């Protein structure tokens, strides 16, 4: 090969390599621009309800013939739709209940700054569960805790923490309230907060951290609500509220709320005579509540809520093993589904039950006279057969030598079914324990299980002699 041919050959090879490098640089540039603007190809919903985007850093190391290019690209995930909860999955089949959470608030109060509370409950958003309670505006080791046995003061506020986190000084005070209910519709939290004078209280409706609506007392006699979670189906939340006598006829209404705004109010209808402190759960396409009759019945009222047409039906749990306290001994107690049993109906305690086909799962105090001990069991035919008393799968949650209190239900949506859980309020202090001047509580929480389980007792556990007075 002569010199001229060598020069031409080297030049051709160099030109080819240069062309390849140029084309690769163009390809890199096109890829970079495409990935950078990919985020704009995602469709956003009309109402702009999206989850915040999370940046992802992509490192691309591209080796070329004689140099290294480090290209860093930041790309956003396409927005995810946030949808209302519809609770359309079936109820989980369970064999009983397994331990889930215990906050030990009273024991911790012996050496730390923990709020004085009562009326606790649990509710979950789509990703996490929270515990709520009505605080007394003071910690336990504080002279303001004296005489906190009283239910309604202007200092009471609704507290909210992750489940299992005691109400410490950093706890969020959601609203002013001496009666409350909370629920998450899939997009945001709704809090119903009642406060004010007994004869002219106000219920505030707080949605997504903002006051949206309110309603005043309609019977001028202690407007009050559930003290456990409300339920939202397809954006409509229902809450049961009562105003009027605690020992005679009262005026109960069911409020329908959408993003914090009251859209409809239905009066109680059906055969229930007195309804307070309902424990509600989704029973698609509606909502079902098991409540407290503080006037005539130790059997619990049932309220069925139709979310679509706002209609209401009510009756009583059929089980002859009744759920309220005080109550007659099981041998003598009765319930015939439609009416109050007129057995030690005056007074009572918040509680829960839920249907399982024709059967009923329920919880109650072990004592039939006082708020002592706690048990759960299933009654065969207890939802459909009058005065049914065949009990199976009994579990002791708190032994009869220890105090209990209010209890209520909350629901958790799993991958294939909706599980039912419950909490028990473990009251300590006044009136029974007169060494101290305060009244407060801790909680224990159980959830339904399809597995096996053992036995135990999960009382509050604080030694009252070690507690601040």
UniProtKB/Swiss-Prot annotation:
Record-listed substrate binding positions: 118, 152, 276-277, 292, 371
Intravirion topology ranges: 1-9
An annotated Gene Ontology molecular function: exo-alpha-sialidase activity
InterPro entries: Glyco_hydro_34 (IPR001860), Sialidase_Influenza_A/B (IPR033654), Sialidase_sf (IPR036278)
Family the UniProt entry places it in: Belongs to the glycosyl hydrolase 34 family.
Additional comment: The influenza A genome consist of 8 RNA segments. Genetic variation of hemagglutinin and/or neuraminidase genes results in the emergence of new influenza strains. The mechanism of variation can be the result of point mutations or the result of genetic reassortment between segments of two different strains.
Protein name per its UniProtKB record: Neuraminidase
Organism: Influenza A virus (strain A/Memphis/2/1978 H3N2)
Species lineage: Viruses, Riboviria, Orthornavirae, Negarnaviricota, Polyploviricotina
């Amino acid at each position: 090969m002569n010199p001229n041919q060598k020069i031409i050959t080297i030049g051709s090879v160099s030109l080819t390599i240069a062309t390849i490098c140029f084309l690769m640089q163009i390809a890199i540039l096109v890829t970079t621009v495409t990935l950078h603007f990919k985020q704009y190809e995602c469709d956003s919903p009309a109402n702009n309800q999206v989850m915040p985007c999370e940046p992802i850093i992509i490192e691309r190391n591209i080796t070329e013939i004689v140099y290294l290019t480090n290209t860093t690209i930041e790309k956003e995930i396409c927005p995810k739709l946030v949808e209302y909860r519809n609770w359309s999955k079936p109820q989980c089949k369970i064999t009983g209940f397994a331990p889930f959470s215990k906050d030990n608030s009273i024991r911790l109060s012996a050496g730390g700054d923990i709020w004085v509370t009562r009326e606790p409950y649990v509710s979950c958003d789509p990703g996490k569960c929270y515990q709520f309670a009505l605080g007394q505006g003071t910690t336990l080791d504080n002279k303001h805790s004296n005489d906190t046995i009283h239910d309604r003061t202007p200092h009471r506020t609704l507290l909210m923490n992750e489940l299992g986190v005691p109400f410490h000084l950093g706890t969020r005070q959601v609203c002013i309230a001496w009666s409350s209910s909370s629920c998450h519709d899939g997009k945001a939290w709704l809090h119903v907060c009642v406060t004010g004078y007994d004869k002219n209280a106000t219920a505030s409706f707080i949605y997504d951290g903002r006051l949206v609506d309110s309603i005043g007392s309609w019977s001028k006699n202690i407007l009050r609500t559930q003290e456990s979670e409300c339920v939202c189906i397809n954006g409509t939340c229902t809450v049961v509220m009562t105003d009027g006598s605690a020992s005679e006829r009262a005026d109960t209404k069911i409020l329908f709320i959408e993003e914090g705004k009251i859209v409809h109010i239905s009066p109680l209808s059906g055969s229930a005579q007195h309804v307070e402190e309902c424990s509600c759960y989704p029973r698609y396409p509606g909502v079902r509540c098991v409540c407290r009759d503080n006037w005539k019945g130790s059997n619990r009222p049932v309220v069925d809520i139709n979310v679509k047409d706002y209609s209401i039906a009510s009756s009583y749990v059929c089980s002859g093993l009744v759920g309220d306290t005080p109550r007659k001994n099981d041998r003598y107690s009765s319930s015939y589904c439609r009416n109050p049993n007129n057995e030690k109906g005056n007074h009572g305690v918040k509680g829960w039950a839920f249907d399982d086909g024709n059967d009923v799962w329920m919880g109650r105090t072990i004592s039939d006279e006082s708020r002592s001990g706690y048990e759960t069991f299933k009654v065969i035919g207890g939802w459909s057969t009058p005065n049914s008393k065949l009990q199976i799968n009994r579990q002791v949650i708190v032994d009869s030598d220890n105090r209990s209190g209010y209890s209520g239900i909350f629901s958790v949506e799993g991958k294939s079914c909706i599980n039912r859980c419950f909490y028990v309020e473990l009251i300590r202090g006044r009136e029974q324990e007169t060494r101290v001047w305060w009244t407060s509580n801790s909680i224990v929480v159980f959830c339904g299980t399809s597995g096996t389980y053992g036995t135990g007792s999960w009382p509050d556990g604080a030694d009252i002699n070690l507690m601040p007075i």
